[in-house]
């Protein structure tokens, strides 16, 4: 089933047809509506977020805020259908064979003696997918400079910088992304990715785009996995027709 947004209302474009004896058709009603309504809701929300991002990659980051494990995992599936390039939900990745993507947490940084050591250790572990979270202490005075230091050391050691960059998770994302982009470019890393998270939705992403932000990758969690501004999908299951059936018999009395 596919969905679209018309005006301010979510609408179903295609229909599911169930042909069955009435009792059997009624038995599956609740299951069908539960599955279709929830996942159509999340897929629709995701498509709006992806549209606002204007072609940038959207990662589903919502498991911790979803309404339970099942909603988080099936919601991740729906988000992939809606246009996400990956999910942080490892179980969803295993069950549905979709890309698992993510970075590290602030707690990773704080568990090391200093930010540089945390970055260096992470880069040693994941050299081909090295996105460093730079806002634990001070984004522009500490985080970005330490990330640049690690990237420089990787390049000098001959380690291919195949996919690398930084993630912003707080503050004025438009301003910080512009400053960080300038610092990365001047250090010789024009292809470094700038990713962002922090309670994003399609409206905030659109606003950041209008402000000329330098973010090209987005991690969207709470608003996507819960469809926070529109928390239910009004799909219905209705009886459309009842077909009469003929009775065939070889009993002459019945024929009369």
PLM segments and residue spans:
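Single conserved hydrophobic/aromatic residue that forms the stacking wall/gate
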Residues: 1-7, 248-256
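General structural signal for secondary-structure boundaries
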Residues: 4, 67-69, 214
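Short glycine-rich loop/turn motifs that provide flexible caps or phosphate-binding loops at active sites
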Residues: 5-6, 81-82, 218-220
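Buried, small/hydrophobic-residue-enriched core segments of structured protein domains
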Residues: 9, 16-190, 200-204, 210, ...
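Acidic side chains
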Residues: 135, 169, 216, 229, ...
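Gly/Ser/Thr/Ala-enriched C-terminal appendages of enzymes
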Residues: 182-187, 192, 200-250
């Amino acid at each position: 089933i596919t969905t679209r947004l018309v005006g301010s209302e979510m609408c179903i474009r295609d229909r599911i047809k169930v042909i069955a004896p009435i009792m059997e058709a009624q038995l599956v009603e609740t299951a069908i509506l539960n599955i279709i309504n929830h996942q159509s809701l999340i897929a629709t929300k995701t498509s709006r977020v992806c549209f606002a991002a204007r072609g940038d990659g959207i990662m589903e980051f919502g498991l911790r805020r979803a309404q339970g494990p099942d909603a988080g995992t099936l919601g991740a599936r729906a988000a992939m259908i809606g246009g996400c390039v990956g999910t942080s939900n490892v179980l969803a990745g295993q069950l549905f064979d979709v890309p698992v993507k993510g970075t590290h947490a602030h707690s990773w940084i704080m568990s090391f003696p200093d930010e540089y050591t945390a970055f260096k250790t992470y880069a040693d572990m994941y050299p081909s997918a090295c996105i460093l979270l730079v806002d634990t202490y001070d984004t522009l005075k500490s985080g970005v400079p330490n990330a640049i230091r690690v990237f420089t050391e990787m390049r000098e050691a001959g380690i291919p910088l195949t996919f690398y960059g930084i993630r912003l998770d707080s503050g004025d994302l438009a301003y910080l992304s512009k400053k960080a982009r300038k610092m990365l470019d001047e250090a010789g890393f024009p292809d470094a990715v700038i990713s962002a998270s922090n309670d994003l939705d399609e409206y905030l992403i659109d606003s950041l785009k209008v402000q000329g932000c330098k973010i090209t990758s987005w991690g969207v969690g709470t608003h996507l996995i819960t469809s926070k501004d529109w928390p239910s999908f009004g799909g219905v299951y209705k009886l459309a027709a009842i077909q009469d059936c003929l009775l065939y018999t070889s009993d002459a009395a019945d024929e009369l």
